[in-house]
Swiss-Prot record:
HAMAP family linked to this entry: Shikimate_DH_AroE
Name by which UniProt lists this protein: Shikimate dehydrogenase (NADP(+))
Gene Ontology molecular function, alphabetical: NADP binding; shikimate 3-dehydrogenase (NADP+) activity
EC number: 1.1.1.25
UniProt function note: Involved in the biosynthesis of the chorismate, which leads to the biosynthesis of aromatic amino acids. Catalyzes the reversible NADPH linked reduction of 3-dehydroshikimate (DHSA) to yield shikimate (SA).
Length: 286
């Protein structure tokens, strides 16, 4: 890596963040594309966010990636939001557009871009998502923006269930796409929806331990189904093994991780990230 007077910076901002794989991904991408840039990890307190964003402008940085817990809080410091970021209510990518600071969310578009190798497009298709956290909302919003026919969200009954239902109703009203919530423990209803589903996604952390399972194992999967687990630190979760045993195409969360990074990289540099080469390196790293 060459560092000189022309080198531009990007960084990921969160707390904690020193464990992040983002510097590995982006610095490798800078090298492979001959882009004179460097990517760092900044672990900062909430009170420093305004100054960090101002540094993007003052230091002519490419921009930032934003991770938890700041994806929502960073919004108030943006000059403008992309349609996806506005709909999701979270920013994971900050772009310096000639001094104008624009907040984007690349989680959803990165996820669906990672499925192109299966010739899969969400337009006019049905998706079933397990979980209703931040990752799930990003995928749901992007699916709606991309013309999904129907989106079913399955979550366990808890204190967050009714607020999630309200959030999904608002997303549905804003996009005109049918989005509804169902109880994850309702096996009969889930089976009915699965029979019509084209894409099944686990957007929970269940399975991160390599043993736990997010839904009833008695459920039967349709032949044409594509099944994705957002978890990437476990190469093949029990959920993916179960789906593969039923004949489904399966994908772990590494594609989503690299896909969202690739979209950020493009927004900053105008260059395509060499995803295939970086995926090979990441498979050795993870």
């Amino acid at each position: 890596m060459k560092i000189d007077g022309y080198t531009r910076m990007a960084a990921v901002v969160a707390n904690p963040i020193k464990h992040s794989l983002s510097p590995f991904i982006h610095n490798l991408a800078f090298d492979l594309t001959d882009e004179n840039g460097v990517y760092l990890a900044w672990e900062v307190e909430s009170k420093k966010l305004a100054a960090i964003v101002e540094n993007v402008r003052n230091l002519d940085m490419y921009g930032l990636n934003i991770s938890m817990p700041y994806k929502g809080e960073i919004i108030k410091f943006m000059d403008e939001l992309s349609p996806a970021a506005e709909l999701i209510g979270a920013v994971n990518t900050v772009v310096n557009h000639s001094g104008k600071i624009i907040g984007h969310n690349t989680d959803g578009i990165g996820f669906f871009n990672s499925l192109k190798k299966y010739d899969f497009k969400i337009e006019n298709k049905q998706m079933l998502v397990l979980g209703g956290g931040g990752a799930a909302i990003a995928l749901i919003a992007q699916a709606a923006l991309s013309g999904a026919k129907k989106i079913v969200v399955a979550a366990r009954k808890s204190a967050s269930y009714d607020p999630l239902n309200e959030k999904l109703a608002k997303l549905s009203a804003k996009t005109g796409v049918e989005i509804f919530l169902t109880d994850l423990s309702g096996a009969d209803r889930l089976q009915k929806e699965l029979n019509q589903t084209d894409l099944l996604v686990n957007a929970t952390s269940v399975g991160m331990d390599g043993a736990s399972f997010p839904l009833e194992k008695s459920l039967l999967l349709p032949d044409r189904l594509l099944v994705v687990d957002a978890i990437y630190k476990v190469r093949e979760t029990p959920f993916l093994r179960w789906a593969k045993e039923q004949g489904a195409q399966t994908e772990n969360g590494l594609g989503m991780l690299i896909g969202q990074a690739a979209e950020s990289f493009y927004l900053w540099t105008g260059k395509e990230m060499p995803v295939d080469k970086i995926t090979l390196e990441m498979e050795r790293e993870v």
